[in-house]
């Protein structure tokens, strides 16, 4: 049969792709059909099928010919044949006649156009259409064959393409939910729409679970919801996008909005991301660390109880069970293990701080605000409150924020502009002075907030009083009275915090009013925010880590709770001389050789206390403690109490100092209670978190025993049924098997006669080529009963465990006191380790305000430097020399020297030994510093403005018992103004305030002030150095020693040389410096000559002022 030229050529690279038909092909002579009637019938059938398919385009399954034709360019296939014999057509018809009718592929629009244009008759037009349909089918088969070969060569279904297909299949929420929970399957979809409208329409009806998720999300729009679906927790919509970004997991595309917005109408499901159930807390911790609020939505019913209930056809009941933020996350299992935080890391305090303030009064520098704060540490139960007035610099707020270092802030009402900017500055940056990003929430404050807060707090604590035992009536009434006497602003904060913590289920922390502390109690030295940063008390100023800080230097603790207590000691040094002496005497006793055995015993006990007992106790109090964690905590308490079981009174402890005796004597007092709780617990089951066997048999509740008996009864009936099933199958006895977690399966061989005896009522569960596995109706019924008993047993076990936690929580205070005693011992041992270092001495405490130190050293620099630190003496006394004017070359060690003095004073009042040869310290009530140069762009304040504002705050707060450090005051303005301000401030500090003062300056003119203090209240000292060489070879050697007198040069050009400024630039600067020095020297010489002339005159011979000026001018020359 003749073929057209386009078909007769062999396959080549040019015609491997499908080409558009030419006009001549329609006029080529066609072969005559041997059965015209049959052919005509087939044509009619194909036209009918083709028409049907055009109407059902949107119902075509994926990978149809239409989809494949779009990818023709990507698939290499042989050139198609144009005609086939009638025998072949008949054969194809016969092959497909038994199966379902095959839907013909719709012709392309271009083909239909050509047929309409060139066909001479309907009959003639049908035949080319028939060829196109057959050609498409053949091409489809060839493509499928090629695809199978392609997949086979890549490695089968496990290759990359196969994996991707599996993943995309699993991503379907309906399939996933069906696998995890049958009751959460998608609702029955409406019949698919016909015609092209179906392609434009989106997914249509929501599933019951999706409606459930939308309802929950609308109530909790401020949270990222992790929803339990079977064995996974899933995020939906916008939550999925956030979770995918923060957790680096896959987000399956879909709808991101929950308001059914028209822009997402074409999407048929929500975007989703998922995490495994056992990894929940790992991912939750990452989300809250990023600053998010996370809600956990759990299935609160199980499949067995659901199947037995009335809502078996409804989705699982789900409920928001937990809400977490950075401050309220107490379920951190990792934080309970390990002794202390890693070296160099910043120890987060975990405080949640609530702040409110009244409307600002005054304007500008006279602005005043009244502030109230309440800070809660949910992980330990500590509560700090304060009520104070703050000035326009907001230094008081800054001090408290830096001391408490909160991880979360709750702002009640609107803050003033200055306060809000300060809070945002401290909390807003990714890595700030707190070491991490701080979460900030805001809540409204009504005009009647004070009255509402008083009423709310009163009712909250009144309920606690009512529920208290009769024996606790006095304590409860005292508790209520203490709370009602709180200041108004504190009450507002307390009420807001109670409401806020109720959302997280942690409101019970406010029951522990024994641990309420006032921040501003004057029993501690005041270290304000500037001091904490300048002296690097908690963090260094380089990377804000703890390495290189005073806390890092003193921290040798072995436990987490000991580390937290030491942090409080370092930030709040004592003012009580008797308590200080008691603490330092205890350290002296711990480091003595006579007590080595007892010290090793204490260290051994602390070394065994691997868990964070303080956090475990508060988790028990909240009812959040896990079974293995409870066992660990109780066993640790038992070990501690038994270790000192021989101590019946403080005198039996083996030490002489009261603080050690009382701490050790309190440890064995809890032994009886701890043993009573441990005796209820099955050790092996608790360790393996087995809730069903957690309690010893004698301690099990009636409900637990009842359901265990019910399970045993059902299992007995199942064993009895074995013989019945055997009779049905004609066997003597059958054995149950368990496959893939499915119990009580009855196995029957496929090729045996027993298979014919299996009743039709038996349900086939699984099978292989050789075996079939069945459940009979009786087995199914009994298994359902067993599952119901199991679920009820689980609920009974959880209830009994919660009751045990509540019973232990009733003993919270004695247990907490024991842990606090252990933390005190840990801190004292840490400080004794510091005291054992060479060069540390026990300080002597004086009643007057003084600092007398011989050969003192900087505690942190000494540890960080490999070279030996140059020691220096310090002598300051309120009745003698109470101020030092420190001068010296740049980089000569001035700042290190004054910091060293302040740090030794702080260490002494912490109760630690100090790095010196000898030390006599008075009780300082505060340390104030004004160091460094920086502006405050947020407040529109220049460097000099900030400098003077901080100085003004110091002058208002400092007392004769304070230590004040001022570093280069006045450098932010012109020399004349700077000198004038510095001189006035220094004179006021020494003469009027009478504070101990260290004043660093490069203004040599100030050195003459010593002459105005005849009793040597002010003294000049300088950092010594040596000069060698001259000109370009001039070198300065820093000795880092403190000497008497004044350094008349700062040697700034030496620093320029060390900074590698260009040599020509340095030479020009040196020339200009020499010219200026000569000019100033000539002026001073002229002034000196003028003074001499005045003195020589008869009228001024006895003028002492002129003689003093003469001496000063001569010294400056």
From Swiss-Prot:
Gene Ontology biological process: mismatch repair; mitotic recombination
PROSITE patterns: DNA_MISMATCH_REPAIR_2 (PS00486)
Listed Low complexity bias regions: 1-14
Acidic residues: bias regions: 127-136, 173-187
Domain of life: Eukaryota
TM stretches of this protein: none
Composition bias type Polar residues, residue spans: 21-34
One term under GO cellular component: nucleus
Keywords: ATP-binding, DNA damage, DNA repair, DNA-binding, Nucleotide-binding, Nucleus
Region called Mispair-binding domain, residue ranges: 200-327
Region feature Disordered, mapped onto this chain: 1-143, 172-205
Compartmental location: Nucleus
Molecular function in Gene Ontology: ATP binding; ATP-dependent DNA damage sensor activity; mismatched DNA binding
Positions of ATP binding: 888-895
Keyword field contains Nucleus: yes
Amino acid composition bias (Basic and acidic residues), ranges on this chain: 35-47
Similarity remark: Belongs to the DNA mismatch repair MutS family. MSH3 subfamily.
Xref: NCBIfam families: PRK05399.1
Subunit and interaction comment: Heterodimer consisting of msh2-msh3 (MutS beta). Forms a ternary complex with MutL alpha (mlh1-pms1).
Function: Component of the post-replicative DNA mismatch repair system (MMR). Heterodimerizes with msh2 to form MutS beta, which binds to DNA mismatches thereby initiating DNA repair. Msh3 provides substrate-binding and substrate specificity to the complex. When bound, the MutS beta heterodimer bends the DNA helix and shields approximately 20 base pairs. Acts mainly to repair insertion-deletion loops (IDLs) from 2 to 13 nucleotides in size, but can also repair base-base and single insertion-deletion mismatches that occur during replication.
Protein name: DNA mismatch repair protein msh3
UniProt organism field: Aspergillus terreus (strain NIH 2624 / FGSC A1156)
Gene transcribed to yield this protein: msh3
């Amino acid at each position: 049969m003749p073929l057209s030229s386009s078909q007769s050529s062999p396959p080549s690279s040019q015609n491997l792709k499908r080409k558009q038909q030419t006009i001549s092909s329609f006029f080529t002579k066609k072969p005559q059909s041997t059965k015209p009637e049959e052919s005509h019938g087939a044509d009619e059938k194909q036209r009918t099928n083709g028409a049907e398919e055009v109407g059902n385009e949107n119902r075509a399954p994926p990978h149809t010919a239409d989809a494949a034709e779009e990818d023709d360019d990507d698939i290499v296939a042989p050139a198609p044949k144009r005609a086939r014999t009638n025998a072949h057509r008949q054969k194809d018809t016969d092959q497909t006649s038994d199966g379902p009718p095959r839907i013909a592929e719709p012709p392309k629009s271009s083909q239909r156009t050509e047929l309409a244009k060139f066909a001479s008759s309907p009959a003639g037009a049908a035949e080319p259409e028939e060829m196109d349909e057959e050609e498409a089918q053949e091409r489809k088969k060839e493509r499928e064959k090629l695809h199978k070969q392609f997949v086979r060569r890549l490695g089968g279904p496990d290759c990359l393409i196969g994996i991707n297909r599996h993943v995309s299949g699993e991503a379907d929420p309906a399939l996933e939910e069906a696998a995890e929970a049958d009751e959460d399957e998608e609702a029955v979809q409406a019949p698919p729409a016909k015609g092209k409208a179906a392609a434009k329409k989106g997914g249509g009806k929501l599933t019951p679970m999706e409606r459930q998720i939308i309802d929950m999300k609308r109530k909790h729009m401020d949270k990222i919801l992790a929803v339990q679906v079977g064995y996974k927790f899933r995020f939906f919509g916008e939550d999925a996008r956030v979770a995918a970004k923060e957790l680096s997991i896959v987000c399956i595309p879909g709808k991101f909005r929950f308001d059914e917005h028209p822009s997402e109408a074409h999407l048929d499901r929500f975007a989703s991301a998922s995490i495994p159930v056992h990894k929940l807390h790992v991912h939750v911790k990452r989300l809250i660390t990023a600053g998010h609020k996370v809600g956990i939505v759990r299935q609160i019913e199980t499949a067995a109880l659901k199947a037995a209930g009335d809502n078996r056809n409804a989705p699982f009941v789900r409920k928001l069970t937990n809400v977490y933020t950075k401050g309220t996350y107490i379920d951190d299992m990792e934080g309970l293990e390990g002794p202390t935080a890693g070296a160099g890391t910043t120890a987060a305090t975990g405080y949640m701080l609530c702040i409110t303030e009244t409307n600002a009064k005054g304007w500008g520098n006279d602005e005043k605000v009244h502030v109230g704060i309440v800070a809660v540490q949910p992980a330990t139960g500590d509560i700090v409150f304060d009520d104070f007035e703050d000035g326009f610099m907001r230094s008081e707020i800054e001090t408290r924020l830096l001391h408490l270092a909160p991880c979360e802030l709750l702002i009640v009402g609107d803050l003033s502009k200055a306060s809000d900017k300060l809070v945002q500055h401290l909390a807003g940056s990714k890595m700030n002075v707190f070491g991490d990003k701080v979460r900030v929430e805001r809540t409204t404050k009504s005009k009647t907030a004070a009255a509402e807060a008083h009423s709310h707090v009163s009712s909250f604590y009144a309920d606690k009083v009512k529920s208290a035992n009769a024996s606790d009536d006095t304590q409860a009434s005292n508790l209520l009275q203490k709370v009602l006497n709180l200041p108004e602003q504190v009450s507002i904060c307390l009420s807001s915090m109670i409401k806020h913590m109720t959302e997280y289920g942690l409101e019970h922390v406010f029951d522990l009013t024994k641990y309420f502390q006032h921040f501003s109690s004057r029993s501690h030295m005041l270290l304000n925010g500037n001091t904490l940063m300048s002296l690097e008390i908690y963090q260094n100023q380089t990377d804000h880590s703890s390495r290189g800080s005073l806390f890092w230097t003193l921290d040798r603790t072995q436990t987490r709770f000991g580390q937290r207590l030491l942090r409080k000691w370092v930030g709040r040094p004592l003012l009580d001389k008797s308590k200080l002496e008691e603490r330092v005497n205890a350290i002296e006793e711990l480091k003595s050789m006579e007590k080595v055995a007892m010290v090793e015993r204490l260290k051994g006990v602390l070394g065994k206390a691997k868990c964070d007992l303080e956090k475990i106790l508060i988790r028990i109090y909240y009812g959040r403690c896990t079974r293995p964690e409870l066992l660990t905590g109780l066993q640790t308490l038992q070990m501690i109490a038994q270790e000192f079981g021989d101590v019946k009174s403080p005198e039996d402890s083996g030490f002489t100092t009261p603080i050690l005796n009382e701490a050790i004597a309190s440890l064995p007092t809890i032994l009886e209670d701890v043993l009573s709780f441990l005796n209820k617990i099955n050790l092996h089951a608790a360790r393996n978190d087995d809730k069903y066997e957690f309690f010893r048999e004698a301690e099990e509740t009636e409900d637990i025993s009842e359901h265990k008996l019910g399970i045993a009864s059902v299992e007995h009936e199942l064993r009895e049924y074995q013989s019945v099933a055997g009779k049905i199958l004609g066997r003597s006895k059958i054995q149950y098997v368990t496959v893939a977690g499915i119990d009580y399966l009855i196995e029957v061989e496929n090729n045996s006669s027993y298979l014919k005896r299996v009743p039709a009522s038996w349900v086939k569960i699984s099978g292989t080529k050789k075996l079939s596995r069945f459940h009979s109706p009786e087995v199914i019924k009994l298994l359902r009963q067993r599952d119901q008993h199991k679920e009820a047993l689980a609920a009974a076990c959880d209830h009994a465990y919660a009751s045990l936690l509540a019973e232990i929580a009733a003993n919270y205070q004695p247990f907490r006191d024991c842990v606090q005693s252990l933390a005190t011992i840990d801190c004292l041992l840490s400080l004794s380790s510091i005291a054992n270092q060479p060069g540390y001495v026990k300080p002597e405490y004086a009643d007057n305000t003084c600092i007398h130190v011989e050969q003192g050293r900087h505690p942190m620099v000494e540890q960080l430097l490999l070279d030996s630190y140059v020691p220096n003496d310090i002598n300051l006394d309120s009745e003698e020399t109470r101020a030092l004017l420190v001068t010296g070359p740049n980089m000569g060690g001035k700042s290190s020297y004054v910091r060293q003095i302040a740090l030794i004073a702080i260490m002494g009042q912490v109760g630690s030994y100090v790095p010196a040869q000898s030390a006599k310290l008075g009780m300082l009530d505060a340390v104030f510093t004004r160091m460094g140069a920086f502006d405050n762009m947020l407040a529109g304040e220049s460097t000099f403005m900030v400098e003077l504002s901080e100085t003004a705050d110091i002058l208002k707060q400092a007392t004769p018992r304070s230590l004040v450090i001022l570093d280069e005051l006045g450098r932010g303005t012109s020399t004349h103004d700077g000198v004038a301000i510095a001189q006035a401030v220094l004179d006021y500090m020494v003469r009027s305030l009478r504070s101990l003062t260290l004043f660093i300056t490069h203004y040599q003119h100030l050195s003459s002030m010593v002459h105005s203090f005849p009793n040597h209240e002010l003294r000049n000292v300088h950092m010594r150095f040596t000069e060698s060489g001259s000109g370009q070879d001039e070198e300065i050697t820093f000795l880092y020693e403190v000497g008497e007198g004044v350094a008349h040069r700062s040697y700034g050009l030496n620093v320029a040389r060390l900074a590698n400024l260009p040599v020509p630039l340095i030479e020009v600067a040196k020339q200009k410096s020499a010219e200026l020095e000569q000019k100033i020297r000539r002026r001073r010489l002229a002034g000196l000559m003028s003074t001499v002339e005045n003195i020589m005159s008869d009228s001024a011979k006895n003028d002492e002022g002129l003689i003093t000026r003469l001496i000063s001018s001569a010294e400056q020359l």
